[in-house]
A protein has these predicted regions:
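N-terminally biased helix-coil "hinge/interface" segments that flank
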Residues: 10, 18, 73, 77, ...
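Activation-segment/catalytic-loop signature of the eukaryotic protein kinase fold
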Residues: 19-111
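Short beta-alpha connecting loops at secondary-structure transitions
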Residues: 45, 105-112, 145-156
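Glycine-rich phosphate-binding/hydrolytic loop that grips phosphoryl groups
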Residues: 58, 62, 99-102, 114-143
């Protein structure tokens, strides 16, 4: 039985990249980006009798990362994106989650100390600059050390490219079904 996030993070390690073909769409409350559709809904796709909860757990993380990749791709059409992505929040506490994100984005993922508190750290940094305790926002960078950088594992690329293609097609193929079930046809 799972006792907390630490156990969930460890369980992801037991499933190969691509979650044995299971794909999760994280649109549990509709979606706004990269497409706007309040009727879009979450789903697990390609579940079989052999599918276990560990595949489902990993597919949820992969699905969230696929959605981030899709947004990142769209953003890249309008503005230059950085070579590395800074990952913050509670999700950044899981090493496997960070590696999955790096693999799916095909970018380095940088995690700072206490990533779950980075919002408060950022607010404190702004106050410190405003009060003159720190000279500039550039100086703040020195105060927030990078803990780890995760590099994409090219061995996982084929599985993730396959699942990402399916992920995007799931929306295209189900857009009308979402409207029928959840909104206006």
């Amino acid at each position: 039985m799972s006792r907390g996030l630490g156990d969930v993070y460890k369980r992801q390690d037991t499933v190969p990249a691509g979650s044995n073909g299971v794909v999760f769409t994280p649109w549990l409350h509709g979606n706004r980006c990269p497409f706007e559709d309040p009727n879009a809904a979450g789903m697990f796709f390609n579940i079989r009798l052999e599918t276990g909860k560990t595949e489902l757990i990993r597919s949820v993380v992969e699905g969230i990362c696929f959605h981030m990749k899709w947004m990142y791709e769209r953003q890249g059409l309008k503005v230059k994106t950085s070579d590395a992505v800074r990952f913050c929040g509670g999700g950044a506490l899981g090493e496997t989650t960070c590696q999955i994100l790096a693999d799916i984005l095909e970018k380095d993922v940088v995690v700072v100390e206490s990533p779950q508190n980075i919002g408060a750290v950022g607010a404190a940094a702004c106050i410190a600059v405003g009060m003159g305790l720190v000279n500039s926002m550039k100086d703040v960078k020195k105060l927030i050390p990078v803990k780890t950088t995760y590099h994409p594992n090219t061995a996982n690329r084929a599985a993730y490219e396959r699942n990402f293609k399916v992920f995007k097609n799931l929306y295209k193929c189900n857009k009308q079904n979402f409207a029928i079930l959840n909104g206006q046809e």
